[in-house]
Amino acid sequence: MSDMVERTLTALPGLFLQNQLGGPAASRAPFFSRLGGLIRGVTALSSKHEEEKLIQQELSSLKATVSAPTTTLKTMKECMVRLIYCEMLGYDASFGYIHAIKLAQQGNLLEKRVGYLAVSLFLHESHELLLLLVNTVVKDLQSTNLVEVCMALTVVSQIFPREMIPAVLPLIEDKLQHSKEIIRRKAVLALYKFYLIAPNQVQHIHTKFRKALCDRDVGVMAASLHIYLRMIKENASGYKDLTESFVTILKQVVGGKLPVEFSYHSVPAPWLQIQLLRILGLLGKDDERTSELMYDVLDESLRRAELNHNVTYAILFECVHTIYSIYPKSELLEKAAKCIGKFVLSPKINLKYLGLKALTYVIQQDPSLALQHQITIIECLDHPDPIIKRETLELLYRITNAQNVVVIVQKMLEYLHQSKEEHIIISLVGRIAELAEKYAPDNVWFIQTMNAVFSVGGDVMHPDILSNFLRLLAEGFDDETEDQQLRLYAVQSYLTLLDMENTFYPQRFLQVMSWVLGEYSYLLDKESPEEVITRLYKLLMSDSISSETKAWLFAAVTKLTPQAHSSPLVEKLIQEFTVSLNTCLRQHAFELKHLHENTELMKSLLQGAQNCEDIVADASLSFLDGFVAEGLSQGAAPYKPHHQRQEEQLSQEKVLNFEPYGLSFSSSGFTGRQSPAGISLGSDISGNSAETGLKETSSLKMEGIKKLWGKEGYLPKKESGTGDKPEASHVPAEGATVENVDQATTRKDQAQGHIPSTEEKEKQLLASSLFVGLGPENTVDLLGKADVVSHKFRRKSKLKVAQSDKTPSAPTAPCSALSLGSDVAGGDEDGLSAVDRGDGELSSELFRSESLSGPPSAEKLESVSLPVPSLFADNNMEVFNPPSSSATSTVKEETPECRHSGLVEICSNEAVSVSSYKVWRDDCLLVIWAVTSKTDSEFTDAQLEIFPVENFKIIEQPECSSPVIETERTKSFQYSVQMESPCIEGTLSGFIKYQMMDTHSVQLEFSMNLPLLDFIRPLKISTEDFGKLWLSFANDVKQTIKISEPGVALTSVLTELQQNLRLRVIDVIGNEGLLACKLLPSTPCVLHCRVHADAVALWFRSSSSVLSDYLSCHCQKVMQTS
């Protein structure tokens, strides 16, 4: 009895404890309570140090638990959740990565789910442990359990790298036919991820994408839109046939035909609508026929998107964007304009911002919209929200012209002084510098504006702004007197700034000052060089000046030393800095000391800017040709450009192989550099093309935008015969009465006898200054700049072309004549013909040409205006509008007959002679072999056979063989040759096989070279198309070629290029020429040519690096041998 009681009393505490912990669930409680306790403990801490101590203790405990061999999968799952929480806090839990993969491999559904979740959070695409997950994913993709398949598809679309795609791609393709819509949708999203990282590997399943677009489930269809939006952005023309499908889908969405679960606050599938609108905007761009298919659905979208929720505002914004992107329709434009007006006039800040953003976009096509909302835009300039003010400045930037540049730049500077955010300062400083260089009214305003830019922008602004400003001062403009006045005012302004006491200037501004004072102080009459050196010496002695800036200052002092005539400050400067701890400054001091001791050497080296001639750098390093030739003869490897080496490196990289017998798969091709978009120089002679291609900017893009508005109003509307819009009154001058400022309001006020207040008058005066030049007589172009602008700072032409003396009373222009010659007489010529002079006479030197069918006809070259050149534009080469007196070039048309080479014997024997010649057709190279019998005997079964050649496609033409070649008769064999992939040269080889009467057959072998030049053809495009191609190409090559005869005319240079390289002259503007060609079948290349005093600067851009390198090399040979 006593034993029984004792046992009962002993067991009671355990029973009470079990009930307290929750009975049977008590075994799970410690793990969940630990996670909850960890979260509560972290949130209760008051310092980062305490948090780190707690997490490290937890990680140590977890490491011991997961490493223990007795740990169950259930315990591992709960530990993995705590590891995820630790990683989310930023602490390293890498010891658990391998256990997460094991958990995904071995657990049940819940444990596998936690394992996959941990893997997707722990690992990235390039992590080496991902290789261990491939077999698990493949096994789960083949599983019959839907949850396992979904988990595998999810992790594939999240973290799978491009090297592992071939292992799972066939399985994911099969899932596109799965009966469950969730599997099909996740498979489409996985393929979308593959398309983003390796588009070449999914090219063969584009037809399955179309099936997904027509899937019966809305979720699968919506997932496929992600892929199509991406593909249409890259190549809209290839998917025009799907326009009706997208329109039909949008009609069903707008009409509410989708299930209710796709609606958001009673708005049917808003994000699906937005994607479809973006797709339609890309498909209908510059395509009237395609745009007509979507007019009705866009009208319906505008009508049904009632302003009752924020998401409908996004739909309306996309509708407006699409309407102004496609081929325009007047009714839709009017409705879109009303929608923009509702946004702009809305009291809600978000809607006002959306309206300004839409107005900023559409202002490029319809500048009259800005005239309708002038007062609202003026009010937005003083809006308390900084984002509204910044977007308003962006809008004003788009409509800047020579008449309103002063007021707009002033507003930008006011905002710049108030802003503290670095990225805003960088963006605004670049735009102000661009506008100042393009539309500066005078020298004083330009220098003062740039001083403000350097002062406010400081050391955070783009370094190219500094170098471009100095280059502009150094190169000058067309007027030498104006150049000197600009430089003199710059020197005077900088001396005035340096004389101000207790004023701090940014380091880059001081660098600009030092360079200008060192170069152009000789222009001063009242200030001596010693006084300038004194000011520079004070800066050198300041402790707040950086070592880099001191180097600039030292260089300026060195330039001024020959003019200072043994200034004691120079000797004092040498003594102080020859013992400096800074290596660079000490080197400068010793150089100055050496020059100071040798007066003759100093005078010969430091002649001053007034005695210096223009220096043209030889970027091609032609003076090293002998050294290169010697190295190549001794077996040295030829130089390969960086992009070519990178392509070879990518092609040789090993990839993971998931098949036992080496299943091949196409790897993603090398993607070239992005098109240049940096704040950069125009037509640089010795610039680095690699650096140019890597810069970035916020400059405006004009690529692909069609001009819909001109001086006569809305161009497509007038062409269609509809009525014209009423013209807004043009504001003649600043301060005049504005007749088009909120006209409806003004008329209403006048009817009611309203007298404008002082504040309203000030707004109207400001509007007259900001929106001057936006009337129909002076509209803005696609970039928001005036159509006709008197460019203040135009680069100086280094070479003056001789003017004709035949008509001294009329303005003359240089005549140019170019010819594209053939290798033999009879080739057609493509050259510059006579130009139309002011007196109506034609005068030029025409090149003689012999044609196979007669002289070619001449055709006037269409002159297409481009924006004015800018040092700060997003493109390194821009062509400015020529003056009205400039010459208009004409180009000869191709002759009807194809050009061909001469007949050349390539092999022969005692019985047969084989000759060949090339015919350069527009679509291919035609090689014709002529087989001629030398004897009286007849021979039979004559056949010509060509061996296959890598990179070339050879097609036998009709009548290519002859059963019998009669005595003394010649028979021709024709083969068309096409280059499939660009290469420098190929060798075409084969044999002619024939049999004489009553004798054995004879085989005669031959070979011939096929250089790349055989596949280059002139490309006939407009100047506008030239600009678009220039912006779209990634591979560019620059080189400067010295010419033997200084002062050569541009026409002579273009003639040589046309005759020898089959280029076509697109336009000639001043001392610059635009040329274009294409590598068959369709690889274009554009060339910008500029003639200097004793050199020619050439700049090639093409989608093929081989083509641009080849043309660059051969241009140098042509120019040096001419």
From Swiss-Prot:
The keyword Membrane applies. It is found in: Golgi apparatus, trans-Golgi network membrane. It holds the Pfam family AP4E_app_platf. Residues 714-728, 745-760 have a biased composition (Basic and acidic residues). The modification Phosphoserine is found at S699, S851. Residues 841-853 have a biased composition (Low complexity). Its main location: Golgi. GO terms for biological process: intracellular protein transport; vesicle-mediated transport. Residues 714-760, 797-861 are annotated as: Disordered. It is a peripheral membrane protein. GO terms for cellular component: AP-4 adaptor complex; trans-Golgi network. Keywords: Golgi apparatus, Membrane, Phosphoprotein, Protein transport, Transport. Residues 726-1122 are annotated as: Interaction with TEPSIN. SMART domains: AP4E_app_platf. Adaptor protein complex 4 (AP-4) is a heterotetramer composed of two large adaptins (epsilon-type subunit AP4E1 and beta-type subunit AP4B1), a medium adaptin (mu-type subunit AP4M1) and a small adaptin (sigma-type AP4S1). Interacts with TEPSIN. Interacts with GRIA2; probably indirect it mediates the somatodendritic localization of GRIA2 in neurons. Belongs to the adaptor complexes large subunit family. Component of the adaptor protein complex 4 (AP-4). Adaptor protein complexes are vesicle coat components involved both in vesicle formation and cargo selection. They control the vesicular transport of proteins in different trafficking pathways. AP-4 forms a non clathrin-associated coat on vesicles departing the trans-Golgi network (TGN) and may be involved in the targeting of proteins from the trans-Golgi network (TGN) to the endosomal-lysosomal system. This is AP-4 complex subunit epsilon-1. It comes from Mus musculus. The lineage of its organism: Eukaryota, Metazoa, Chordata, Craniata, Vertebrata.
